Amino acid sequence: MNRETFDIQPIGRFYGSNTAIRRPREIACFSYDDQHKFHLGDSSLRYYYPPQLPADLNRGFDTFQKLDDAADEHIDALLDTIAAMEKETGKRCEADIITWRGMMTKILTAPFDDMNGFEMNATCFQGTMCKQLQRQQRMPPGMASQDLMAYWGYKFETISVLDKTWDEASREEIEGRENLVVNNNAQYCSVVRTGIGRTKLVLGGEVDAIWDSKPERKEDPINWVELKTSAEIRKDWDMVKFERKLLKFWAQSFLLGVPKIVVGFRDQGGILRRLEELETANIPNRVRKSGRGTWDGNICINFAATFLEWLKSVIKEGGTWRLRKAEKSSVIEVYQVEESGTGDILSQAFLSWRSTT
């Protein structure tokens, strides 16, 4: 069995150089509706409008319509959207890697995320590597407090968005958001073309809301907003924990080209107390100036560029591969699982479409 390893440590070797970054640009989009059914287009796009404060994030927990994530969707929706775009434009979507934003977030944050591990499956087809998360063993339902804290985040999103621009929304729609049933089945997903170093990427990922509206020119950046919740900062240790959370906040938004993050700070009882707007591009400098050294954005980018270049040299056409980083490990393993085929990574519909082009 072919097996290669990549050492994350020492991360000092990724310090200093300036990796070229291709600004993420949306090339397509798709939506899931309230029943989590797939649709091409932006039907689930939502518009940011700040909530009234204070707000009780516990409200409506007993009526929460929670997404059933037992079904493993692979990257089917992403591939279906790419195929539809190719049919419309008559051009093949060229990329070195096609994957979800979440997969790239794990790679980008790996130099400073010692505790968490990951497993991904990958295959190379027509010169493009496609990656998806290896389905983990399902954990038993969390304690009530864990489930409730997860709900707080969805509640914050619900009371912070509108399904139309604020000037088109009625006062009742704006003020009645706290009474809405929280449903996390509906999602708007952006598909972007970007690049890190010499690796061309096409990434798909959920976007919470837009600040204003989409520009008429597709080339222009979109004012996306990412919505996050965090505990109030009361002492130094709280700030350290928050800066560590900022690593993931930054990575997720950086990869999709989301320029602004709105953080809702809540108390221990789940009451939303204040909002803070963060510019994604300024977060690494903010963390660097704090002097705590919890993470460095340049090291993350340089590491990702080096790792992806190495990965392209390892995973060749044909067969399926596994990328694995064990918990508390500083080594990423890459090994071949099957010598031929694409496993269940690529849908039959996508394979059939590409075989005709």
Curated annotation (Swiss-Prot):
Its EC number is 3.6.1.-. Substrate binds at C189, E206, K228, Q252. Keywords: Hydrolase, Metal-binding, mRNA processing, Nuclease, Nucleotide-binding, Nucleus, RNA-binding. Its main location: nucleus. InterPro entries: RAI1, RAI1-like_fam. It comes from the Eukaryota. Pfam families: RAI1. Its cofactor is a divalent metal cation. A divalent metal cation binds at E157, D208, E226, L227. It is found in: Nucleus. One of its GO terms (cellular component) is nucleus. GO terms for molecular function: 5'-hydroxyl dinucleotide hydrolase activity; enzyme regulator activity; GDP binding; metal ion binding; mRNA 5'-diphosphatase activity; phosphodiesterase decapping endonuclease activity; RNA binding; RNA NAD+-cap (NAD+-forming) hydrolase activity. One of its GO terms (biological process) is nuclear-transcribed mRNA catabolic process. It catalyses: a 5'-end NAD(+)-phospho-ribonucleoside in mRNA + H2O = a 5'-end phospho-ribonucleoside in mRNA + NAD(+) + H(+); a 5'-end (N(7)-methyl 5'-triphosphoguanosine)-ribonucleoside-ribonucleotide in mRNA + H2O = a (N(7)-methyl 5'-triphosphoguanosine)-nucleoside + a 5'-end phospho-ribonucleoside in mRNA + H(+); a 5'-end triphospho-ribonucleoside in mRNA + H2O = a 5'-end phospho-ribonucleoside in mRNA + diphosphate + H(+). Divalent metal cation. Belongs to the DXO/Dom3Z family. Interacts with rat1; the interaction is direct, stabilizes rat1 protein structure and stimulates its exoribonuclease activity. The interaction also stimulates rai1 pyrophosphohydrolase activity, probably by recruiting it to mRNA substrates. Decapping enzyme for NAD-capped RNAs: specifically hydrolyzes the nicotinamide adenine dinucleotide (NAD) cap from a subset of RNAs by removing the entire NAD moiety from the 5'-end of an NAD-capped RNA. The NAD-cap is present at the 5'-end of some RNAs and snoRNAs. In contrast to the canonical 5'-end N7 methylguanosine (m7G) cap, the NAD cap promotes mRNA decay. Also acts as a non-canonical decapping enzyme that removes the entire cap structure of m7G capped or incompletely capped RNAs. This is Decapping nuclease RAI1.
